Each structure stands twice: as structure tokens, then as C-alpha cells.
Amino acid sequence: MTEQIQERTKAQQYNFNKLQKRIRRNTGQAIADFNMIEDGDRIMVCLSGGKDSFTMLDILISLQKSAPISFSLVAVNLDQKQPGFPAHVLPEYLESLGVEYKIVEEDTYSIVQDKIPEGKTTCSLCSRLRRGILYRTAKELGATKIALGHHRDDILETLFLNMFYGGKMKGMPPKLVSDNGEHVVIRPLAYCREKDIIKYSDMAGYPIIPCNLCGSQPNLQRQNIKQMLNDWDKRFPGRIETMFRAMQNVVPSHLADFELFDFKSINKDSGVINGGDIGFDKEEMPVATVEDEDMVQEFDPSLKLDVTNI
């Protein structure tokens, strides 16, 4: 019996190490691709107590130990005084890690409850208040970058939300300047899959704090988009990866935004632009390869992307 437990423990540790390596590699690649972290940076890691931010802090600590540059981390949590919030959990966890941290106490819960009618979602106002407090805290701490735990699925969901409900082809940038113009915000998990983060978080045993202590309901539109993408991921292996790659291979001349591309000046002397267009025939859609080491099944040609049935 003891041998079976030991063997199972070894197998679990192997799987954990393998998953950590993949998340670490994806995070490191995103940091490099977007120059998220530079020598001498002081990174304020926003820690909500959820799986994403716990994983982000864990991986950044790991990368910090072997990075060719020097940077420091300070974890920050905003205690918004929501009923039932376990205020002791994060300080105890962060103390055990030996990482620098700051708990900011601001009763935004009462403000939101006072301003938002009962039954209405509080997320929008809560988010604005939280953002302002975190910007202020970053300045107080002398942070050069603010790290958020959004992952690849969040980025894709935002793209489809904006297309379906906002009429914009706009996602969630891996790196940006904050809306007050004073901070650089980074998303180190931009290349990481949510399902990997969920699995990794479960294996790591983080002291997860529920995100719905305020009683607010999740955004229904985002939930619908998430369900749609999860369904595609199950039915059409590789589609999610291909869509994310598409966000990195934008061809403005083959879209319709005349602010991004000068269509008006095109004439027959302009030459072929970005490969041109076959014009009168339907373009053959290439079957993209699935770049996922966990997918061992053969790709079924019958699952080839049909752009008329999405």
C-alpha cells in the first residue's frame, strides 16, 4: 500500500512539474515577446486570491530566480471589506513564501452597495474603484509595472465580446499604458491556457478565496462567450490555438478599417498587396496544426473549420 502511495505521489509530482514547465515557458515567452519586464523593474503583482493571480505570482517568483536580469516583486491585495472575506489567508500565505507584500484596506463594498440598486451587477463600479486604488498603491510603492493575471482565454473572450456586442475588433492587450497614463500594465499569463491554470492551481493547493463574496452575478455575456469557446475547444481541437495565433497575424489590408489601411489610394499601379486576393473563388482554408503536446489524437479532416457554421 505504501509503495502504491509513493508511486502515485511520484506520478503526481511528475505531472505537476510538467505543467509548471509549460506555464513557465509560456509566461517567459510572453514576457520576452512584449518586453514586459526589464532590468531593475519593480513589479507590483496584483493578488486577488483567485487561481490566476496565485499562479502568476508563483511563476514570476520562479522566473525571478533564473532570469538574466534583476527585478523585484511586491504582491498587493485589496481588501474591499466584503462580508466573509478571510483577511488572514493572504498574509499567512505570503509570509510563508517570504515575498514582499502589502494589504490595502479600502471599504469599496459599502460604496458599491450604496450606489448600485439591488439586483444589478456591481462589477463595473467595483472595478473602477479597485483600479484607481491599485494605481495609487503602485505609485506609493514605486512600482514600475503592474502585473495582472489575465490569461489567453480572457483575451479571446474579450475579442469576441467586443465583436459581438461592441462592433469592434478589440481584445485585451498583453501590455499597455494605464488609462490614467501613469503606469505600464502587463499580463504575463497572456500565452497561458485557463485549463492549464485550473489544473496547476488544483495541484498546487492554493488557498483560493471565492470571487463572489459580494453576491454579484457574473457577466452573462462573458459567460456565454466562455461557453461558446469551451464548446469549440471540445468539438474542434486546435481552433482556440489558431484563433489566438490570428490575433498575432493581423493583415489590415484584408480587413475593412480605412483608418488602419489606406484603401483610397489603391489603384492598378499599387501592385499586389500582402499576397493579393483570389477575388472570384472561395479561398481554400488551411488546416492548422495543433501545437499541444497533450493532444495525441489525429486531427479529423471532417472537423476542418467551416467559417459559415460557427
From Swiss-Prot:
Pathway: tRNA modification
Keyword GTP-binding attributed: no
Subcellular location as annotated: Cytoplasm
Record's cofactor remark: Binds 1 [4Fe-4S] cluster per subunit. The cluster is chelated by three Cys residues, the fourth Fe has a free coordination site that may bind a sulfur atom transferred from the persulfide of IscS.
Disulfide bond residue pairs: none
Catalytic activity annotation: cytidine(32) in tRNA + S-sulfanyl-L-cysteinyl-[cysteine desulfurase] + AH2 + ATP = 2-thiocytidine(32) in tRNA + L-cysteinyl-[cysteine desulfurase] + A + AMP + diphosphate + H(+)
Entry cofactors: Mg(2+); [4Fe-4S] cluster
One BP term from GO: tRNA thio-modification
Chain span(s) of sequence motif PP-loop motif: 48-53
Keyword Nucleotide-binding (UniProt): yes
An MF annotation (GO) of this entry: 4 iron, 4 sulfur cluster binding
NCBIfam families assigned: PRK10696.1
Purpose: Catalyzes the ATP-dependent 2-thiolation of cytidine in position 32 of tRNA, to form 2-thiocytidine (s(2)C32). The sulfur atoms are provided by the cysteine/cysteine desulfurase (IscS) system.
Oligomeric and partner information: Homodimer.
Name the UniProt record assigns to this protein: tRNA-cytidine(32) 2-sulfurtransferase
Higher taxonomy: Bacteria, Pseudomonadati, Pseudomonadota, Gammaproteobacteria, Vibrionales
Gene this chain is encoded by: ttcA
